[in-house]
Amino acid sequence: MTELLYQTDAYLREFDAIVTSVNDDENGILLDRTAFYPGGGGQPNDVGTFIIDGQEVTVTKVKRGNLHIIEGDLPVVGTQVKGVLDWDRRYKLMRTHTAMHILCGVVWRDYEASVTGGNMDILSGRMDFEFERMQKELVQEIEDKINIEVAAERDLNVAILPREEAFQIPDLIRTKINLL
């Protein structure tokens, strides 16, 4: 089981790990621990580099299950690697992710509209909401409310919960339940 370092420290930029498995078919490796986010929920995966035996190797993708797809030759099981995230990309994705949570929170709080879809990229994103009738005037109104929330500089709290427990918190789930 891979220790998911990004769950406890989203600001971690580098880490040391050991190769636990090699996937020849996808040119990927599994590690005992990782700070690379594999993507999910509309958020792209992290990319970056591994330093393996003094050589820099590009991490092009991280898949579910934390399979790190790399360029070049695969190391053997037991090899020590140093992971280095593309921090500029990660930080921009973090900011975008947070902004989308603020958008979702404002729309839920003030209009009781659930999220029906979405996607994000670096400093851009899209969220679909279940509005009975979306009016153009609402766009500026929502933006103004979001800016008030950003200006409030609220503390952000992260909690990793089992799925079943998260579903028991009514104000936490703002996505159409059939999409989860």
Regions found by a protein language model. Give the residues of each.
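A glycine- and charged-residue-rich anion-binding loop/surface
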Residues: 1-180
